Amino acid sequence: MINLCLAKFSPSELLECHVHNALNVMKSIMNSFIWINEFVGKDFWELLFYTIILHDVGKCAKGFQKNPKKWDYRHEILSTPFVKFLSYDEDKKNLIALSILTHHKYIEELDSGMQVIPRIYKDAYLEKVEELLENKNYLTTFFFPKINSWERLIFKKDLKKFNLSDNWEEQIKNFDFKELLEWYEENKEKRKIHLIFLKGLLNACDHLASAGEHKILTLPNLKKRVCEKLKNLRELQERVLETYKNAILEAPTGYGKTETALLWAHANLDRVGEKKVIYPNRVFYILPYKASINAMYERLKKKYLSEDGMVTILHSSSKYYLYVNEYEYKRIESLSKKIYNPLKVLTPFQIMKSFFGVGFYEMELSQLAKSLLIFDEIHAYEPNITGIILGMLEILIKDYKAKALIMSATMPTFLKELFKEVLNPQELKMEKENPDKFTRHRLNLIEGNIIDTIKDLKEYKNYYVSDNCRLEKPVLVACNTVDRAIEVYKILKKRGFNVLLIHSRFTYGDREKLEKEIKNNLKSYDFVVATQVIEVSLDVSFNSILTEPAPLDALIQRFGRVNRQGWKKGIIKDVYILKEGSEKDKYVYKNEIVKKTLEVLKEINGELLKESKVQKLIDKVYENSKDIKDEILKIKKESLQLFNNLIPLYKSGDEEKFYKLFKGLEVVPEKYFDKVKQLAKEGKYIEIYRYLVPISFYNLFKYGDSFSYDKKLKIIFTSLDYSEELGLLKNNLNEGNWIL
């Protein structure tokens, strides 16, 4: 009697079924990713084919079949020796063997402790081989004979590259892992790209098949989709359709940069097929803020890519966003981390993970090959992030043949020059259209600080007026720090105004409620007091703004929340910038940049902020930008060194560095301890997210006494006061890193 062997147990799936499904995924990728041969040669698909067939053979071990969770060995170690029976040269067999060996864990993880790769001490290995051989009849009479039919399924012909020898059991026992690892050490640089693609696409096929998906999705005709929605294409939208390379796009807010980006993507996508054309490249739409990503995901899904899975979302809290918006969050979030979706809206950090060796980075790098990267709001990043993006782009364009589109309404020329050095792009600016038709603001510099100004405001019809400003309801009051925003909110509230406060120190649940309230009931409020979160988070339109001083590019982002569609009817609204900020602003912005901004704006005080003048104004502000430029270039150089040292199949030592650089922390106010404890007890972990407040590593380390880690719940709690109205109150905390 032959015992059938399972590859998956919940639900049960036979080994040959899992392999068959993974091969179907491979077939889908092979028919789409036509460029793979440009990187790794013509026989790559054959190598991947046999890698998939053999990758889980070790699961036939009796102990694994009996109880995989309690089995004390690695099935991939037992799968690896079967490459001996492939009729390829040793180099190709070693590529397959290493990809199989590391498809779950990296080399140093397998080569330590109880999971030791059998180099010298082979007793444990030989014992597990005997377990495998107890099910050899399944392999020889049921599984391996299917290989010929799989060859015909994928390649339409017999390859006959796999042939068991008569003494195959002994050859398995005598497989030389030491020799394999020595070959790896000698060839890991020379064969780097082969190892990345072979392991990466094995993981892609394996993971998708395990998730119940048997093909990858490809994009529809984006030009057709966009043109169905737009009556006429604008000048730049026409031009990007003939831009078959990297590009930098500069256009004012309201121009339609999203549609322009989709048209650029259409122009640069590969075409596969004749009767039915598919567009196989992966497109990454990259934005700096999670709120912007959420809004873009909804827009693309509802307007252009409504089919299931065509567009997805990926950031540190996307799972919770999908959950609260009643999407099939587990499935969508799982697939978003795989190679399934053709268009991903995400933060740059999700792509950077690959270059820091985080997670299944070979799979991510495989789908980044020949990808199209759209960077919107590129001006919004700190110099260190900009430097890393530049380093990442240099490698993606040079080594992975990716293309990039950089977009911004407010990009300093020095920043544009840095990207031009990497991209060698086509520059796209309005030439025929008059940019001033997008003008919608009159600029007013006013004396004093925000506290004194709001104390003097008097209500007059639909306005709030003082000696130096006339604010039309609803008013956005933009503050540079959370503390100042709370102070302003309290004063306005005490004066009897209908006011709402929003900043980043609310729990995610409260922040979600506040954003929905602004979207649905903005006109019922006199004032909305906010920090920088309002610059990017909401697609709403205020009638006026009173803002603390900030760098010009940040101010323009804030103005973008005012009179958003006014340009269509020639409506102009006043924006008011105070000349004085607060003492704590130095932790947020460079004093010299803010000072220079005020000097530049003084020249056009009381005038229209014409779109045709914006670039010159920004360049004046940043005319002495050498320090910022040097910082960016320094980080770029360091990033390139780090990225080029990334070794495939090996766990990167830079993973911790990545999380320290970019990943903040979330804490739970102690007032929610009992609630969170109960949710954990009920297994409702996604609900716990409602009670998390984001903080920085800086504050955790510097003010550690206010935080405690619950080992059982694996959650950091804070003793700082929390109010649903005001957010997390810093008490004794320094303002420095509580800025948003």
Please name every model-derived segment.
Residues 363-372, 377-434:
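Post-DEXD/H (motif II) to motif III coupling segment of the RecA-like Helicase ATP-binding lobe
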Residues 282-296, 467-493:
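Conserved strand-helix element at the start of the C-terminal RecA-like helicase core
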Residues 413-468:
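Interdomain hinge/linker at the junction between the two RecA-like core domains of SF2 helicases
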Residues 2-220:
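Accessory nucleic-acid engagement/destabilization modules that flank
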Residues 244-265:
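Walker A/P-loop
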Residues 2, 559, 565-740:
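C-terminal accessory region of SF2 helicases/translocases
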Residues 70-73, 505-508, 525-572, 577-582:
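Conserved RecA-like helicase motor core of SF1/SF2 enzymes
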Residues 279-304, 315-318, 411-415:
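Conserved Walker A/P-loop ATP-binding site and its immediately adjacent core
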